Each structure stands twice: as C-alpha cells, then as structure tokens.
From Swiss-Prot:
ATP binds at residues 436-442. The gene is tlcA. Belongs to the ADP/ATP translocase tlc family. Disulfide bonds join 37-85. This is ADP,ATP carrier protein 1. It comes from Rickettsia conorii (strain ATCC VR-613 / Malish 7). It is found in: Cell membrane. GO terms for cellular component: plasma membrane. GO terms for molecular function: ATP binding; ATP:ADP antiporter activity. It comes from the Bacteria. SUPFAM superfamilies: MFS general substrate transporter. Provides the rickettsial cell with host ATP in exchange for rickettsial ADP. This is an obligate exchange system. This energy acquiring activity is an important component of rickettsial parasitism. The chain crosses the membrane at residues 34-54, 68-88, 93-113, 148-168, 185-205, 219-239, 280-300, 321-341, 349-369, 380-400, 439-459, 466-486. Residues 55-67, 114-147, 206-218, 301-320, 370-379, 460-465 are extracellular.
Length: 498
C-alpha cells in the first residue's frame, strides 16, 4: 500500500525541486532555453572580447572602450530601440535586433576576423602616430584595431539589449504574477549553467590539440556556435508566439495586467533627489562604490592575466575557466543567499560584500606589491610563481564579487527601499538607477582612462599603486555608507512596525 505521508512528502519535495506545473512546461522550457542561448552567447562573448582587446591592443584600452565607445553606443542603441518600437510591432522589433547581432557575428567570423590585414590600418603608421601623440595613444591604437573594438562593443551591447531588455521585457509581458514567483528563480538557476557550458566549449575549441580549422582561425567554431545560438533564439521566440501566446491556458492578455511604468528621472532631478535625501544618497553610494571598486581591481587583474597568458587563445581559455567558476559560485550564492538574509541582520548581510571586497582586494594588491618577498617564501611551497598567485587571487576576487552581487548585494539594496514612503521609494529608486547605474558601471573606467590620458607614459604596472589607493578609499566609503544607511534603515523600520 502507498503511504499517504510519503506521497505528500514526495509531492512537496518535487514542487521545491521543480515548481513548474506539467502544463506550464510548454511555456517555461522554451523561455528557459531562450535565456540559456542568450547567456551562452553572453558568456562566450565576455571571454573572447577581452582576449582580442587585451592581447592585441592592451589591457589599458578596456577603460577607454567602456567610457568613450560602449557608453555612447548604448545610448544610441536605446534611441534606435525606442524608434523601432514606434514603427514596428514588439515581435518584429525582437527579430530586427536579434538579426542585426546575428549578421554582425557572421561578418566578424567570416570577414573581419580571418582578414585583419585587409581591414586594419598599417601597424607601423599607428605606432608612429602613438609616439607622436602620446596623450591620445590609446585612442589611436583602438582605431588601429577597430574591428576588435567593434567586437568588444557588440559583446557589451548583447548583454544590455538581448538579456536585460528584450528577453526580460518579453518574460514580463507574458508571465503572470503567480507564475513569475516560480519561473524567475528557476530561470536564474538554469541560465547560470550556460557559464560552465561555455567554459567547456571554449576549452575544447581553442585547445592546441583540437584541429577543427586552420591554426590562425581557431575562433571560427566559437563564432559559428554563437550564430547558431542566435538563430535558435529567433526560432524559439517565433515558436512561442505561434504556439504559446495562442494557448489560453498559458497566455491571456486580459489577465496579464499592464505593468506600471517605472518613474523616470532626468540626470539633474536624480542629483537633486540624492543630495536632498541622505537615505537615498547612501543607497546610491553603495551602487557607485561597488561598480568602481570592481572595475579598479578588474583592470589591473586583466593586465596580469595578459602577462601570464599572452596569446589570444590562452587568454580566452583562461577567461572561459573564469566563467566556469563564476557560474557555479553564482548558483551557490543564489541558493545560500536567502538563508543568510533570513538568519542575520540587514547590517551583517550588507557588510559581507564590502568586507569580502576589501579582504580579497588587499590580498590581490599584496601579491602584486610584494611579489619578490612572496616569491622567496611561498613559491616553493605552492609550486607557483608570484604572477600566477596574483592572477589566481584576482580571479577569486572577481568570482566572489560577482557571485555576492546577485544574491546579497542586490537583495540588501532592494530591502533598503521597503521602509520608504511610496513617493520617495519610487523616485528614490529611479534616481539611484540613473546616478548609481551610470557612475557605478563607468566610474572605474573613467578614473583609469583619465589617468592614462594625463600620464601617457604609465601603463597598469606603473599605475597600480594609485589605483590600489583609490580602491581602498572607495571601499572604506562603502563601509561608511552601509553603517550610515543601517542607522537610517533601523529608524524607519521601527516607525513602520509601530
């Protein structure tokens, strides 16, 4: 005989492991597959883009690309997107943008990448200009390898346009509130599996023993995979529009309520909000400090990775391994993050990220500044040189900082909005997104690129002590902001509970 208690237990356990109803699989699985394909491309692009720029132009060029090319390109892309939405149906907008990326990947794979000498200016001319105009030498070197700069920009835009905008807009449009509670967490878990899968694919395609194509075309199979993945995204989206959005059990436009538009604020209004509200200002400082501190360490780390892995293939394989660890750590933090939030105070949970950043950042810079001492005492024990150890510590720092962001940092930041009154909560969040989002993502790149313009003789080797000093100042300000916000947060929470 079946035991009812055991049956109930197994039923509850299955809901925890797979909270999707059987009939909902028709809707959930294609969406999860779409997100997996988008993230597969995203993580592959992230590994490759740095390999091309760092090894062919220099690690210093990344900060210039982020500040002067990626940022304006993102603004232009958003303007084009808004215009497309005015003249086309939402479904067709998706096809146009995805097809544009697919077309670019094909162009790069079969024209720009195989024939760099035909599309790039003469290297000697570029070098002579760089010597003649040292303050703008990084701009000149970027122009000299413009196809790699364009690839870097498109890689950055893929994450913004395809994942943050098109996929989530589609998901929010067709997902009911009760479905979202079960679907979205599962999306995160399944999609993060794309990162370790990317690592395996990159490791195989670029391995010296793998002979799929000629040696100088090693990256072509990866580009073919990205083109195929983009095509599968289009096909899946088309299938969902034909088969899911026509199924009344899975999609009813009347039940999926129109979401309220988020409050949008101008840059000036955002500054006013942040400077007039200490509480909102603290939250903005958290976001800015996170973005700047991550970028400052990441730039130095990538320059060290280049020293250790000087070829495109070796560098990209290493970045693939980085994606592998990042994927599993992100999944682990997603699973344990909610438990940490339930068992500790807001202050403790919010303090974990800056303290982790401080400790790992200090260890990373210590391995750079005291490499000769470390080489004397630890190399024999650990069987690795100081450069390899510095790169390893830098990878740990980057993996943890990104893993913690999606679980603890974002969660504690969003919790801080809850005690605010409705008006301040809506306007404050919009202000933080404008100021914190823009200055957090580009702040570190602006600091680094400005430094290299003012001091053209400096590279990352000479600039590291200055960037390290700025890093520690930023993290200390971050800790101060967490403590200050906690005082304000406790006062508001106590008021709302009374």
């Amino acid at each position: 005989m079946n035991n009812p208690k055991n049956d109930n237990y197994l039923s509850e356990l299955s809901k925890v492991i797979w909270p999707i109803e059987r009939y909902e699989n028709k809707k959930f699985l294609p969406m999860a597959f779409m997100m997996f394909c988008i993230l597969l491309n995203y993580s592959t692009l992230r590994s490759i883009k740095d390999g091309f720029v760092v090894t062919d132009i220099g690690a210093e060029a990344i900060s210039f690309l982020k500040t002067y090319i990626v940022l304006p390109s993102a603004v232009i892309a958003m303007v084009i997107y808004v215009k497309l939405c005015d003249i086309l149906k939402q479904e067709n907008v998706f096809y146009v943008i995805t097809s544009f990326f697919l077309g670019y990947f094909a162009l790069f794979a079969f024209v720009l990448y195989p024939y760099p000498d035909l599309v790039h200016p003469d290297p000697e001319t570029i070098e002579s200009w760089s010597v003649a105009y040292p303050n703008v030498k990084w701009f000149i070197r970027i122009v000299g390898k413009w196809s790699f700069a364009s690839f870097y920009t498109m890689a950055e835009l893929w994450g913004t346009m395809m994942l943050s905008l098109l996929f989530w807009q589609f998901a929010n449009q067709i997902t009911k509130t009760d479905e979202a509670k079960r679907f979205y967490s599962m999306f995160g878990l399944l999609a993060n599996l794309a990162l370790p899968v990317t690592s395996v694919i990159i490791g195989y395609c670029l391995h010296e023993k793998t002979q799929i194509v000629a040696e100088h075309l090693k990256f072509v199979p990866l580009f073919v995979i990205m083109i195929t993945s983009s095509f599968l995204v289009i096909l899946t989206y088309r299938w969902m529009n034909k088969n899911v959005l026509t199924d009344p059990r899975l999609y009813d436009p009347a039940l999926v309520k129109e979401k309220k538009a988020k409050a949008k604020m101008s840059l000036i209004d955002s500054f006013k909000m942040i400077f007039t509200s200490k509480y909102v200002g603290y939250i903005a400082l958290l976001l800015i400090a996170y973005g700047v501190s991550v970028n400052l360490v990441e730039g130095v780390w990538k320059s060290k990775v280049k020293e250790l892995y000087p070829t495109k293939e070796a560098y990209t394989i290493y970045m693939g391994k980085f994606q592998f660890y990042q994927g599993w750590v992100a999944i682990a933090f997603m699973l344990i993050g909610s438990n940490i939030l339930r068992k500790v105070s807001w202050l403790t949970a919010a303090m974990i990220t800056p303290l982790m950043m401080l400790i790992t950042g200090a260890a990373f810079f210590a391995f750079i500044f005291f490499d000769s001492v470390i080489a004397m005492h630890l190399t024999g024990i650990l069987a690795s040189g100081p450069l390899a150890l510095a790169v390893m510590i830098g990878m740990i720092q980057n993996v943890l900082s990104k893993g913690v962001k999606y679980s603890l940092f974002d969660a504690t930041k969003n919790m801080a909005y809850i005690p605010l009154d409705k008006d301040l909560r809506v306007k404050g969040q919009a202000a933080v997104e404008v100021i914190g989002g823009r200055f957090g993502k580009s702040g570190g790149a602006i600091i680094q690129s400005t430094f290299f313009i003012l001091f053209p003789a400096f590279g990352f080797v000479e600039a590291t002590p200055y960037f390290a000093s700025i890093f520690f100042v930023i993290v200390i300000l971050w800790i101060y902001a967490v403590k200050g916000l906690n005082k304000e947060y406790k006062v508001l929470v106590n008021k709302t509970e009374k």
